């Protein structure tokens, strides 16, 4: 099968937004207009094309990023629908990694919301160009220019309208295009018929003002145009478009559009903007990686004649075809039935079938080309973030880093039959989601699952029940505490057993000191003159790493600690790797009395949006939860309280906030950093953990 769309006619985009800004509805409309679905599915009726897991349809939120392909004006647009809820930010990061551009959807009433900020920051980190779609222009309180101002105030983004709405709320009738200077009115309910007309008289002045602002902003992106502009010459439409495109692709400029996906207005113009202003795979820098086993840099340029290289960005279990691995091809082509190398794991994989996904049906294809997104069936060892490449030209593309889980709870199967199924099901879920971890507590024998927040784990337990038919009892959520030290000290660890026969002898002196926050464990070998032979030094490090997992105070992992091995002794016959491993762990135990160990707890960054009248009550509640209020700001007719609160105090907060604000308050929270636990509380935790 020959290539259908050239590289410059391909767009890989994501739709990103705050929860409920209308992201899935927007994606739906894109699929409708590009002829991929015949009937529009409404999210609030629970039947949308993109939200295909049962829970997504029930909760009306998007959890997994389904990847779909659509066609518009002889271009292919691959769309990844990303979740807007903070517990799923990893899904967002994962999809941003393989995109070339994104559409940020805002709610016209609220503008930039807390989760928009998080996702925007992630997109900036990965250098993803964006156009902004101000959605829900038909909603009461919709205000386009206010939404644009929030882009400047809250994100410091160089964003400029390239459209203006005609009317708002119930009177939202059409859209003015500030590049072509024409107006579009919508003739029928489905918005498929639009006609370009002259701008109505009452809007001409405003349109001219914003057209000039746009021209000035675009001229600043290009020196030649700036000269022309300063000399008072008119810029042509093509020059204006080219400048906006250049600025957008360089992540220096963000065009802002408006519309109402629900009312079918503005979506086709947004698709035009995706083609006009967002980059094709040829416009973004070639992806860099390195050759396995060496740190030599390798670059993979987009092109079908290049060696094959792709990144797996999502693994899911499908009830019909089994394990599906979604991947983005950066260079070269791949045929179904061929072999590739998973260079991350150094395994050979056979690609069984290749599917191009369309939200809920799939099309089998024989070849996938450079720049495309597809899903493979039959990969056994590949997980999220792995590189797939040509067996003769090996490369490892930069992979993704995922945060550690901050909350965990125990799950117990209700029956013996459930027990066997549960193990398999949890392993599958952990394979799909790198921020979900599962392990067995050796002391209690319980299965512990860990994730990024309460909603995250709720949904996992829900999936166990629905997809895998596993009934389980769920324990109360527990916080993942950490430990660290506050003082440096030199400590000895000596393990000697010499009572006839082969003995054991290991002896080390280690200096433990606090490391910078977030730096983790650092081991320094400071041995001179071979007082501890070279072959035993890895064992000292391994012994420390193991012992750090078991903690000093309450059995929680020790972080941000530096250990310098500077002295010790050995015995020609009795020393062994094992003996030095034990000696190192004994040194860490002895550090407890000298290094002032402390307990750390995860601090969450919390933003609560509440009507003014509940403000005092909500702030009092935050303080009673050991929270620190960092600031407040008015947002529309509501107040936003920003605070840091320990995760341990945030369980059940959703219910408490609902009852305090009669359901009108909303909040978002995500993990920010670790902080020392107050002494009285840490003593209780230590007591509880040592079983007193």
From Swiss-Prot:
One of its GO terms (cellular component) is cytoplasm. Keywords: Cytoplasm, Elongation factor, GTP-binding, Nucleotide-binding, Protein biosynthesis. It comes from the Bacteria. GO terms for biological process: ribosome disassembly. Pfam families: EFG_C (PF00679), EFG_III (PF14492), EFG_IV (PF03764), GTP_EFTU (PF00009), GTP_EFTU_D2 (PF03144). It is found in: Cytoplasm. GTP binds at residues 17-24, 81-85, 135-138. InterPro entries: EFG_II, EFG_III, EFG_III/V, EFG_IV, EFG_V, EFG_V-like, EFTu-like_2, G_TR_CS. Coiled coil: none annotated. The keyword Nucleotide-binding applies. Residues 8-282 form the tr-type G domain. SUPFAM superfamilies: EF-G C-terminal domain-like (SSF54980), P-loop containing nucleoside triphosphate hydrolases (SSF52540), Ribosomal protein S5 domain 2-like (SSF54211), Translation proteins (SSF50447). PROSITE patterns: G_TR_1, G_TR_2. Belongs to the TRAFAC class translation factor GTPase superfamily. Classic translation factor GTPase family. EF-G/EF-2 subfamily. Catalyzes the GTP-dependent ribosomal translocation step during translation elongation. During this step, the ribosome changes from the pre-translocational (PRE) to the post-translocational (POST) state as the newly formed A-site-bound peptidyl-tRNA and P-site-bound deacylated tRNA move to the P and E sites, respectively. Catalyzes the coordinated movement of the two tRNA molecules, the mRNA and conformational changes in the ribosome. This is Elongation factor G. The gene is fusA.
């Amino acid at each position: 099968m020959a290539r259908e769309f050239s590289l410059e006619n391909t767009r890989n985009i994501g739709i990103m937004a705050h929860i409920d800004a209308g992201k899935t509805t927007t994606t739906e409309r894109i699929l409708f207009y590009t002829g991929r679905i015949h009937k529009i599915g409404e999210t609030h009726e629970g039947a949308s094309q993109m939200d295909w897991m049962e829970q997504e349809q029930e909760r009306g939120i998007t959890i997994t990023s389904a990847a779909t392909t659509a066609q518009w004006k002889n271009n292919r647009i691959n769309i990844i629908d990303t979740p807007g809820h903070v517990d799923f930010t990893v899904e967002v990061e994962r999809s941003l990694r393989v995109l070339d551009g994104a559409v940020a959807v805002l709610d016209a009433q609220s503008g930039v919301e807390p989760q928009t900020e998080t996702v925007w920051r992630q997109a900036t980190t990965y250098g993803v160009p964006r156009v902004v779609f101000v959605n829900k222009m038909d909603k009461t309180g919709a205000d386009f220019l206010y939404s644009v101002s929030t882009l400047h105030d809250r994100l410091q983004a160089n964003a400029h309208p390239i459209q203006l709405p005609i009317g708002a709320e119930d009177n939202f009738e059409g859209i003015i295009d500030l590049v072509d200077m024409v107006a579009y009115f919508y003739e029928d309910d489905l918005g498929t018929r639009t006609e370009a007309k002259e701008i109505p008289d009452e809007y001409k002045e405003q349109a001219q003002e914003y057209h000039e602002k746009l021209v000035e902003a675009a001229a600043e992106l290009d020196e030649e145009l700036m000269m022309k502009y300063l000399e008072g010459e008119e810029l042509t439409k093509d020059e204006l478009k080219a400048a906006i495109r250049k600025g957008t692709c360089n992540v220096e400029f963000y065009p802002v559009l408006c519309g109402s996906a629900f009312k079918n207005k503005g979506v086709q113009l947004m698709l035009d903007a995706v083609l006009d202003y967002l980059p094709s795979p040829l416009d973004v820098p070639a992806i860099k990686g390195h050759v396995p086993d060496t740190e030599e840099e390798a670059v993979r340029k987009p092109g079908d004649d290049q060696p094959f290289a792709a990144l797996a960005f999502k693994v899911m279990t499908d009830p019909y075809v089994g394990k599906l691995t979604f991947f983005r091809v950066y260079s070269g082509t791949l045929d179904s039935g061929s072999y590739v190398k998973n260079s991350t794991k150094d395994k050979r994989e056979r690609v069984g079938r290749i599917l191009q996904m369309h939200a809920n049906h799939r099309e089998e294809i024989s070849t996938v080309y450079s720049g495309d997104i597809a899903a493979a069936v039959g990969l056994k060892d590949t997980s999220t973030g792995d590189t797939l490449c040509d067996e003769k030209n090996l490369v490892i593309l930069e992979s993704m880093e995922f945060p550690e889980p901050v909350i965990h709870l125990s799950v117990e199967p209700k029956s013996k039959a459930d027990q066997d199924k549960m193990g398999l099901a949890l392993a599958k879920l952990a394979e799909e989601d790198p921020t979900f971890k599962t392990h067995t507590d050796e002391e209690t024998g319980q299965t512990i699952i860990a994730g990024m927040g309460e909603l995250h784990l709720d949904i996992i337990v829900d999936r166990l029940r629905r997809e895998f038919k596993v009934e389980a009892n769920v324990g109360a959520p527990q916080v993942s505490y950490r430990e660290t030290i506050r003082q440096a000290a030199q400590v000895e660890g000596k393990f000697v057993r010499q009572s006839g026969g082969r003995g054991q002898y290991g002896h080390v002196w280690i200096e433990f000191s606090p490391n910078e926050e977030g730096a983790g464990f650092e081991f320094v070998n400071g041995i001179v003159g071979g007082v501890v032979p070279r072959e035993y030094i890895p064992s000292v490090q391994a012994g420390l790493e193991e012992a750090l997992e078991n903690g000093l105070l309450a059995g929680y992992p020790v972080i941000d600690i530096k250990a310098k091995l500077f002295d010790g002794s050995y015995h020609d016959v009795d020393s062994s790797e094992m003996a030095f491993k034990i000696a190192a762990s004994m040194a860490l135990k002895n550090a407890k009395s000298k290094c002032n160990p402390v307990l750390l707890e995860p601090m969450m960054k919390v933003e609560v949006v509440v009507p003014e009248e509940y403000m005092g009550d909500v702030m009092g509640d935050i303080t009673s939860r050991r929270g620190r209020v960092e600031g407040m700001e008015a947002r529309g007719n509501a107040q936003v309280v920003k605070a840091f609160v320990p995760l341990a105090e945030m369980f059940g907060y959703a219910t408490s906030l609902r009852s305090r604000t009669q359901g009108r308050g909303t909040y978002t929270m995500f993990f920010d950093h670790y902080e020392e636990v107050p002494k009285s509380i840490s003593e209780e935790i230590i007591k509880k953990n040592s079983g007193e």
